[in-house]
UniProtKB/Swiss-Prot annotation:
SUPFAM superfamilies membership: WD40 repeat-like (SSF50978)
Keywords linked to the UniProt accession: Nucleus, Repeat, Ribosome biogenesis, rRNA processing, WD repeat
Family: Belongs to the WD repeat IPI3/WDR18 family.
Protein's recorded name: Pre-rRNA-processing protein IPI3
Assembly with partners or alone: Component of the RIX1 complex, composed of IPI1, RIX1/IPI2 and IPI3 in a 1:2:2 stoichiometry. The complex interacts (via RIX1) with MDN1 (via its hexameric AAA ATPase ring) and the pre-60S ribosome particles.
Role description: Component of the RIX1 complex required for processing of ITS2 sequences from 35S pre-rRNA.
Keyword Repeat: yes
């Protein structure tokens, strides 16, 4: 298994047709470049990706144009151009929440194949005018149009549980919405949909936000960055501010450790600062959390660079007085590497422990707008040709319905969606109909080895039984005996040949 990074730039304003703008899919651990996309550019936070591989898509909000470009895997150029009511500055994809009702009468253990045509549930976007749009991808219906902010929306994210949608804007406000209320088009009541929570703690525009991945909604945390040099942590369920970190420079982007051990913040002076969320108490030697209870913590300057990444401060353009700004951040799945992009179009992979750059990617001609990390299997390269052929033959079936410009009808009978229903897969089950534990455990062991194997060499060791070992030993013994007999015969022939030579002399 290999980790790959997808990154895209904002585009050069002088290049009106985006001829010099590209997006790349590159391996983190090797020199492989899996794909590139032409005429690919967007605003910061204006790109969303479903994944890497056949059947996956990339959505980009075209800067200063009322268009969304859709790229399909295996095709470099734009696959679809979807017109929208106005230009969007940020977008996000929301997957449908999994059902929580486990009925014992139903066969919940049945597995299904991955459909060729698959799309997320919703696409949400924010515009420069402060409006919030939500479309259903499988039908193209416009489910929500709302004046959310007084100024432009800069960032938008949805919770993994599908309960909340969070927007941040240039009006220094962060709004938490109940997603079910926003898209309830069949609710005929006259009540006005209001934000679940309005956060007005910041004094300057919000630049980025992120949420922790949790299956328990009570542990859902919100992390925000702002141009007022603050990073704030909120508890969404209790509607409370937990901690405020004050940084020496404006915070432009944020990402977090997969285990919620630390935050990584990109600053407008080219530095990436790590903020630990836990520390060891020097008196009790106990690991304690940092902050909480509305504490305000000032992050001092790191003179020894123990918590700072400085790779982006090195300028490539001489004579330019503008400081380099770290525009986007993300982190690898194991939390050992951080991927960062800056205003000069550079993307670096840095080791979190040593703070050193371990790899740099092909630079873009404009500031980086979006970075995402995904995984691909070991045989991914071998399947590229097959996937390309499949995409060409299945083009009509992979097209997304055009987005509507008016709100969807409140008549539920007019709601039509396009789905690809896959076939069932066979799995090893026991007498009770459940998957055999030994089979499940073996599959998990194989998945673990594939995740650890970051090279193209298959390092999985195959274990054979004792019967096979006995057969192999018996075969080896017979071969060894035959070799000994052949060796003795060869020595006898050499001696006879020597005797004949002596007689001739």
């Amino acid at each position: 298994m290999d980790e790959v990074v997808f990154y895209i730039a904002q585009g050069d304003p002088a290049d009106k047709h985006s001829q010099e703008s590209y997006g790349y899919v590159t391996s983190i651990h090797s020199s492989k470049q899996y794909a590139s996309y032409r005429q690919a550019d967007s605003h910061i936070n204006g790109t969303a990706i479903t994944g890497i591989g056949p059947g996956e898509r990339i959505f980009t909000a075209v800067p200063n144009k009322a268009l969304i470009n859709v790229y399909s895997w295996g095709k470099e150029s734009v696959d679809q151009r979807i017109p929208i009511p106005e230009a969007l500055t940020c977008i996000t994809l929301i997957n449908h929440p999994n059902g929580s009702n486990n009925n014992s009468d139903n066969d919940d253990n049945q597995l299904y194949k991955l459909p060729n045509y698959r799309v997320p549930w919703l696409l949400a976007g924010g515009s420069k005018s402060g409006k919030l749009y939500i479309w259903e991808l499988s039908s193209g219906n416009l489910l929500c149009v709302r004046d959310a902010h007084y100024q432009g929306i800069t960032t938008i994210k949805g919770s993994s549980c599908g309960t909340f949608l969070i927007t941040g804007g240039e009006d220094a406000r962060c709004l938490v919405w109940n997603l079910a209320e926003l898209i309830s088009i069949y609710d005929k009541s006259d009540h006005q949909v209001k934000p679940y929570w309005q956060i007005t703690d910041n004094t300057l525009p919000l630049t980025d936000l992120c949420l922790n991945d949790t299956h328990n909604i009570n542990d859902l945390k919100l992390y925000t960055t702002s141009e007022d040099s603050t990073v704030r942590i909120y508890d969404i369920v209790t509607k409370s501010l937990l901690t405020t970190f004050i940084l020496p420079s404006s915070a432009e982007c944020i990402t977090k450790d997969p285990a919620n051990r630390a935050l990584y913040v990109g600053l407008n002076n080219g530095l990436v600062r790590s903020i630990p969320l836990y520390s060891i108490n020097s008196h009790t030697s106990v690991l304690e959390s940092i902050g909480g209870m509305n504490k305000i913590i000032t992050v001092d300057a790191d003179q020894n660079l123990k918590e700072t990444f400085v790779a982006h401060q090195q300028k490539t353009k001489t004579g330019d007085d503008k400081p380099v700004v770290v525009t986007k951040l993300t982190i690898s799945f194991d939390g050992t590497s951080i991927i960062s992009g800056d205003s000069e179009g550079r993307v670096f992979v840095s080791d979190i422990v040593t703070k050193q750059v371990v790899k740099s990617f092909t630079p873009c001609n404009s500031p980086i707008a979006y970075i995402a990390v995904e995984t691909v299997p070991d045989d991914f390269v071998n399947n590229l040709a097959t996937s390309t052929t499949t995409n060409k033959a299945d083009k009509k079936h992979r097209m997304i319905p055009q987005f509507k410009r008016v709100l969807a009808s409140t008549n539920s009978e007019e709601h039509q969606i396009f789905l690809d229903i896959p076939g069932k897969t066979t799995a090893t089950t026991n007498a009770t109909g459940n998957i055999d534990f030994a089979t499940w455990l073996q599959s998990k062991q194989s998945e673990e080895l594939q995740f650890k194997n970051l090279s193209g060499i298959n390092s999985i060791v195959k274990q054979v039984g004792n019967e096979n070992v006995s057969d192999l030993e018996e075969k080896l013994q017979r071969v060894s005996q035959a070799y000994t007999e052949l060796r003795n015969k060869h020595e006898e022939l050499i001696k006879e040949h020597a005797k004949l030579l002596d007689k001739l002399e």
